[in-house]
């Protein structure tokens, strides 16, 4: 398991070897670990918002002896698994224009600026897959943070216009019904609105 300390130590260790400034946007469980919503994550997931970030990080990983499984997946010398997502795509979700701008600053090193996606976009990227671990993570976000379900649905709907998600309506319906059944948040009115939505 990868804790917040392990995440930050890795970035602190590799930062001196970079020759230019780069942005890393933590996503998924990595972001939730950095935000202290989860204790740990199985691997590290980062978005590289600019082409120069992508080039610099992949070149650095190669120089430092990281094992390249494919263009997206790398393994560090101490066996940490790192997944990289380029530009505005994460999994099958294309982030809307203000997503990177609205990301949260976590740490600034000499070369690396580390941020996390905002909570709404973290939920949206997890809704795209909606595996059991994603459901657990989303419920944890709702329990620990103030999330406006209406704002979430509006942003989700905008994101789905430009994304390639198989069952967008069914996924958010399942989530909102679960949140309602667990008395975590009231979503009945939104569920009726979702029923009328044609993505």
Annotate the PLM regions:
Residues 1-199:
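Compositionally biased terminal segments of proteins
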